[in-house]
A protein has these predicted regions:
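Canonical tetratricopeptide repeat
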Residues: 47, 85, 99, 121, ...
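Short helix-capping/linker turns of helical repeat alpha-solenoids
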Residues: 40-43, 54-59, 78-81, 94-96, ...
Length: 313
């Protein structure tokens, strides 16, 4: 049930200028020569602005010239700009304007991370956690997530909670997991809200309290978290802390299944197979089992195969 957060699409965040000017690429384009003059004279803020303008990954609709972006990022990085250092790391990781190099990416992320950049700390942690161009090092990942978490970053807090929950790179400590989940959940991180709900649901690291579990599941579900939607469905199906209702369970499973969540697809298949909360429909059951099985859900694979044998297929 715990929603293990990951950057599955491999997109590492870059940092953009917080000024209104970066939102007006037309203005920048019209005054480009003047801005370049300021940058050549050593104006660090304009150097970074030009880097963002030329970097299509940061400033959509800008110059889209990775070579120029790298040039200005490097110049301003030498002056200690951590945003530029982080963005250089992303460009090396993706091979934009430079030869792709995970080693150089981690070098720039580390430089920015050591100077306190939360985004760079998370990017460096991400590389070590998933072995993206470097050797997997869960302890190193946990170290950098902790630094970002201690600066109040909700995403890092939620991930650090997961690492404590499973003992990933740190000694397993469910009390510490609950602590970090709570910090992130109170900031609105829906993954942490779901995970905190799991802890209350199961009595892991806290006294079991289904009402509190449901509260956190609902907060996450309102943000579209499919895992939380499934967990609410399971509470209604089993009557944990709520009036038992297979009809309401089906409603929540449908929300999560529509998002492609395999656990909900399997659970919905079970309801259709038994006619519990929905009209019995073996074809619908097989469809949902198949969808879950295609994502590697083992129980669904077994049920799908069983249905095929019953149908003589």
């Amino acid at each position: 049930m715990s929603d293990k957060k990951s950057n599955a699409n491999g997109v590492y965040p870059q940092e953009a200028v917080k000024s209104d000017i970066v939102k007006n690429e037309e203005f920048i384009g019209e005054h480009l020569e003047t801005l370049r003059e300021f940058a050549e004279r050593g104006d660090a803020s304009v150097m970074y602005l030009l880097g963002c303008y030329y970097d299509g990954g940061v400033c959509e609709g800008g110059g889209n010239d990775p070579d120029e972006a790298v040039k200005w990022y490097k110049k301003v990085s030498r002056l200690g700009n951590t945003h530029a250092m982080n963005n250089l790391g992303v460009m090396y990781l993706c091979g934009q304007g430079v030869r792709k190099s995970a080693a150089k990416a981690s070098k720039w992320f580390r430089k920015a991370a050591e100077l306190g950049s939360v985004v760079a700390q998370k990017n460096l942690a991400e590389m070590y956690r998933y072995g993206d161009g470097v050797r997997v090092d869960s302890a190193e990942a946990a170290k950098w997530y902790r630094k970002a978490a201690e600066q109040g970053d909700a995403e890092a807090q939620g991930i650090l909670g997961v690492m404590y929950y499973y003992g990933e790179g740190v000694r397993k400590n469910v009390a510490a997991a609950v602590k970090w989940y709570r910090k992130a959940a109170e900031q609105g991180d829906c993954g942490a809200q779901n995970n905190l709900g799991v802890c209350y649901d199961t009595g892991t690291g806290v006294a079991q309290d289904w009402a509190v579990a449901l509260k956190w599941y609902r907060k996450a579900a309102r943000h579209g978290n499919a895992c939380a939607q499934t967990n609410i469905g399971e509470m209604y199906e089993t009557g944990r802390g709520v009036v038992k209702s297979a009809v309401r369970a089906a409603k929540w499973y449908e929300k999560a299944a529509a998002q492609g969540y395999a656990g909900a697809q399997y659970d919905l298949g079970e309801l259709y197979a038994s006619g519990n909360g929905v009209a019995k429909d073996l074809h619908a059951a097989e469809m949902w089992y198949r969808k879950a099985a295609e994502q590697g859900y083992a129980d669904a694979q077994y049920k799908k195969n069983s249905r095929r044998q019953e149908n003589g297929e």
